Amino acid sequence: MDDADLRERLEQRLMSHGVYVTDLSTDDGTLHVAYETASPGDGVPHREVGRVLNRLLALLDEGWEPLDVRAEVSSIEEDLRGAWRADAEWLAAHDRGDLSDVDLSQRVIDTIEEA
């Protein structure tokens, strides 16, 4: 699955939730995703982190190979709100059933860096 296909598949599911992918690229084994959130307030909305993460997990069934994920979150006014990450190892462990939904979510939430 190339970057254009991956971006399209992410956008299809996320736009209805107020998450707008603004940039997506793969570089040296890392998926970089930038998106804007329509959610009010400051910081990184945890619910939207979950939505992006769940969509990536669903794409594993469609042939996407897990990569380290680095995400940057901005407001629709383009103000940086923060960043988060998910390691490829965590995604693969979840896919194998070795890491629960709760444990994966907690690991990712723990990586959030507010702007």
Region roles according to the model:
Residues M1-A115:
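Acidic, polar-rich N-terminal leader regions of halophilic archaeal proteins
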